[in-house]
From Swiss-Prot:
PROSITE patterns: GLYCOSYL_HYDROL_F25_2. One of its GO terms (molecular function) is lysozyme activity. Residues 21-231 form the Ch-type lysozyme domain. Residues 219-480 are annotated as: Disordered. Residues 219-472 have a biased composition (Low complexity). Its main location: secreted. Its EC number is 3.2.1.17. The active site is at D25, D114, E116. It comes from Dictyostelium discoideum (Social amoeba). This is Probable GH family 25 lysozyme 3. It is an enzyme of class 3 (hydrolase). The lineage of its organism: Eukaryota, Amoebozoa, Evosea, Eumycetozoa, Dictyostelia. It catalyses: Hydrolysis of (1->4)-beta-linkages between N-acetylmuramic acid and N-acetyl-D-glucosamine residues in a peptidoglycan and between N-acetyl-D-glucosamine residues in chitodextrins. The keyword Secreted applies. InterPro entries: GH25_Enzymes (IPR051595), Glyco_hydro_25 (IPR002053), Glycoside_hydrolase_SF (IPR017853).
Length: 480
């Protein structure tokens, strides 16, 4: 009898494992080829594609990606990051109507409304944000679209407060615990008591494509497909982001939450914005380490990395992109604070004697960091840099920076370096700096000693872009 029971349990376990599904989500800055999708289909049964980015609007690559994904054997869902303070179409009902119109004839499973934080994206009044999100979801439902919500335990209350009226819609949540299951119960927010999909890992790479990883129970092969003109039976890929590190698209709080987002061209973990090495509920996108900011404000959810710093000044709706250094909103430990801004920011890869500018929190080891203020600990490296800011397309100069040495020694010398980075869709922010270190002092937490030096820097920075962009929830995320 005992052997029979064990045999039955074994069969049930095997069936359960076999019926579970793997999915990936990609940001609007990612445009995989047919061969990429064929490769991805060997490891996944679903793909969720970002179709709308903040104030930038529709991702024109969606129709061709959907067609190629279906040909590769993948079921397709879409996600949209909308925000009340983004440029472009600011009315949520109008944005949804425009999106649905552009998706006319495109068959997909579920349209996920991505709810996550990003710099300058939302009103400071939670009730206003809640009304915005409700209108977006309800408008999509009224238009006959299968609609769900993507968010995380940390992002939801930060954005819409105690809103519970949408709990009857499917939930895709983010919790970066690298555990493809619902055992974490990270879906207990907003009135939900269950979820349909979990984003359990932020930006990583499969088949050379930057993706977030998702898990859902069951085969996911029999959901109703939405299009503006017809319905048919097809698979519904489900998605989500946030958690003890959540990602798509932005900065963190709680055990850290965030949205999704990932792009191939130097994207953030996106997507917001890599994934966190500790707990973080912020959807962030790819990048092993992140310091960045546009010299324009960003309406995209920031992307993730193992360390995070981001800030924006000026105006720009572009989600920050990843590179060797990139925008992030996700902490490498647990953090309940939104990311802080530095006095100057450049994102992307850096060459020269110093690294990327921007303020950075967390710890870094043996890495020269450039920039405004720094907290945390650093290896036996000294850093110096000038601060830089500018509005989109503008040239400005700034001077004065502090340099720090973790060992208490001071250094003198001159250094030059240039940095450039690219946003998901458009133009790059770049700047150059040169200067000699003279004298001065700086201090940081967990650092001892003093260093002296002054630096001046001048350069131009700006960001512009049109077309497809990434968001944070971490579709961040994106899932941006």
């Amino acid at each position: 009898m005992n052997k029979l029971i064990l045999s039955i349990l074994s069969v049930l376990l095997i069936v359960s494992i076999a019926s579970a599904g793997n999915g990936i989500d990609i940001s609007s800055g990612t445009n995989p080829s047919s061969s990429d999708l064929a490769c991805l289909a060997k490891q996944n049964s679903k793909i969720i594609v970002q179709t709308w980015s903040g104030g930038y609007g529709f991702n024109s690559n969606v129709p061709s990606i959907v067609q190629a994904a279906k040909s590769a054997g993948l079921s397709v869902d879409l996600y949209a990051f909308l925000c009340s303070q983004c440029s472009g179409i600011t009315d949520p009902a109008e944005a949804i109507k425009t999106l649905v119109s552009k998706l006319n004839g495109v068959k997909y499973g579920t349209l996920w409304i991505d709810v996550e934080q990003c710099n300058g994206c939302w009103s400071s009044t939670l009730s206003s944000n809640a009304q915005y999100v409700q209108t977006a979801v309800q408008t999509a439902s009224q238009l006959g679209v299968n609609v769900g919500v993507y968010s995380s335990e940390g992002e939801w209350p930060q954005t819409v407060g105690s809103l519970t009226s949408l709990s009857s819609f499917p939930l895709w949540y983010a919790h970066y615990d690298n555990n493809p299951s619902f055992s974490d119960q990270g879906y207990n927010f907003g009135g939900w008591s269950k979820a349909v999909m979990k984003q359990y890992q932020g930006t990583t790479t499969q088949c050379g494509v930057s993706v977030d990883l998702n898990w859902f129970p069951g085969s996911g092969s029999s959901t109703t497909s939405s299009s503006a003109t017809s319905s048919s039976t097809t698979g519904r890929p489900l998605t989500s982001s946030s958690g003890a590190g959540t990602g798509g698209h932005s900065s963190s709080s709680g055990a850290g939450t965030g949205g999704h987002s990932s792009t191939t061209g130097g994207q953030t973990s996106g997507q917001t914005s890599g994934q966190t090495s500790g707990s973080s509920n912020q959807p962030l996108s790819s990048g092993s380490s992140q310091d960045s900011s546009n010299s324009g404000s960003s309406n995209q959810p920031l992307s993730s990395g193992s360390s995070q710093d981001s800030s924006n000044s000026g105006s720009s709706n572009q989600p920050l992109s990843s590179g060797s250094s990139q925008t992030s909103g996700q902490t490498s430990g647990s953090s309940n604070q939104p990311l802080s801004s530095g006095s100057s920011q450049d994102s992307g890869s850096n060459s020269g004697s110093q690294g990327t500018t921007g303020s950075q929190s967390g710890s870094s080891s043996s890495n020269p960091l450039t920039s405004g203020s720094q907290s945390g600990s650093s290896g036996s490296q000294s850093t110096s840099s000038g601060s830089q800011s500018g509005s989109s397309g503008a040239t400005g100069t700034s001077s004065t920076a502090s340099s720090t040495s973790a060992t208490g020694s001071s250094s003198t010398g001159s250094s030059t370096g240039s940095s450039s980075g690219s946003n998901d869709s458009g133009s790059n922010d770049s700047g150059s700096s040169s200067g000699s270190n003279n004298s001065g002092s700086s201090s940081g937490s967990n650092n001892s000693g003093s260093s002296s030096g002054s630096a001046s820097s001048s350069g131009s920075s700006g960001s512009s872009g049109s077309g497809n962009y990434t968001s944070g929830s971490g579709n961040g995320a994106f899932l941006f």
